[in-house]
């Protein structure tokens, strides 16, 4: 099923205007992951209409333009639309990218991929399920959503990949040279997880184990932080953590794990 040709101006945007903080190359780690992930590439390549939406691009469209350039290495005829709920941030199109007003309703578009970075972080945790549901219901068949968070310089990043059935994976990615240990990413977890980093929760168990593996891999430090992390990741796999295999050399330290391994535990009724 092809995506809508253009945003529908008569649809009322769903969401709240957020701070809009952005910066050049801030989302590069997420872009690199999208451009090399097998599932994302398969959906983009097989889409009748390869439409990608960057939801909530902020005060500047620079990261939308960067994403478009990186994803066009996967499919050159990719269509990209940047959506902003703040009408004052909507800018004229450039470099083959269109910009329009829109929120979680996606302005009536039917994209195969939506990137929402540093958007839901500014909402309460209780708002996440409905926001996910609204976005996912607007995707084209087989569509994907990337819900991510990062720091101001893009050195510490985390994102969840979802389809219409719900979350599929969690990825943590960080600058090998400025992050001391994996748990430093805790403050940049997506909203669905950031308040669950407490003892007994799966995400806390993962981060604690990752720090321990990182410490045990200290003898490899002379070979650099990337080599040290590769060994630490192998230790995590040996302990039963189902980390996705690393199939190429990465400039980032990174782990991707099935959502089932980190999903929040159900709240216990009082």
Please place each PLM-identified region on the residue numbering.
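Class I SAM-dependent methyltransferase Rossmann-like catalytic core
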Residues: 1-50, 54, 59-61
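Class I SAM-dependent methyltransferase SAM/SAH-binding core
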Residues: 53, 57-107
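Short, conserved active-site loop motifs that form the nucleotide-linked donor/cofactor pocket
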Residues: 97-98, 112, 143
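A short SAM/SAH-binding and catalytic strip from SAM-dependent methyltransferases
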Residues: 110-129
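A short glycine-rich, Lys/Arg-flanked "PGG" loop and its adjoining helix->strand segment in the class I
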Residues: 121, 129-141
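Conserved beta-strand signature within the Rossmann-like core of class I S-adenosyl-L-methionine
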Residues: 139-154
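A conserved mid-domain beta-alpha-beta active-site/ligand-binding segment of alpha/beta enzyme cores
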Residues: 158-231
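C-terminal non-catalytic accessory extensions
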Residues: 221-270
């Amino acid at each position: 099923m092809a995506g809508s040709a253009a945003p529908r101006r008569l649809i009322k945007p769903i969401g709240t205007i957020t701070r809009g903080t952005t910066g050049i190359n801030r989302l590069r780690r997420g872009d690199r992951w999208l451009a090399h992930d097998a599932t994302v590439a398969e959906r983009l390549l097989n889409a009748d209409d390869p439409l990608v939406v960057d939801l909530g691009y902020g005060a500047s469209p620079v990261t939308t333009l960067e994403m478009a350039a990186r994803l066009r290495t996967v499919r050159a005829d990719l269509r990209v639309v940047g959506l902003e709920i703040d009408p004052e941030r909507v800018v004229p199109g450039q470099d083959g990218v269109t910009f329009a007003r829109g929120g979680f309703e996606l302005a009536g578009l039917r994209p195969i991929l939506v990137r929402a970075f540093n958007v839901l972080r500014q909402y309460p945790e209780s708002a996440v399920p409905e926001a996910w549901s609204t976005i996912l219901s607007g995707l084209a068949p087989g569509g994907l959503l990337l819900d991510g968070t990062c720091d101001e310089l893009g050195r510490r990043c985390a994102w969840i990949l979802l389809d219409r059935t719900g979350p599929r994976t969690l990825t943590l990615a960080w600058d090998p040279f400025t992050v001391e240990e994996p748990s430093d990413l805790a403050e940049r977890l997506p909203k669905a997880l950031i308040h669950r980093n407490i003892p007994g929760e799966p995400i806390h168990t993962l981060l604690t184990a990752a720090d321990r593996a990182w410490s045990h891999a200290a003898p490899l430090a002379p070979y650099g932080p990337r080599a040290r992390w590769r060994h630490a990741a192998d230790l995590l796999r040996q302990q039963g953590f189902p980390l996705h295999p690393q199939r190429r050399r990465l400039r980032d330290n990174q782990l991707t794990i099935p959502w089932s391994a980190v999903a929040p535990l159900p709240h216990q009724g009082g």
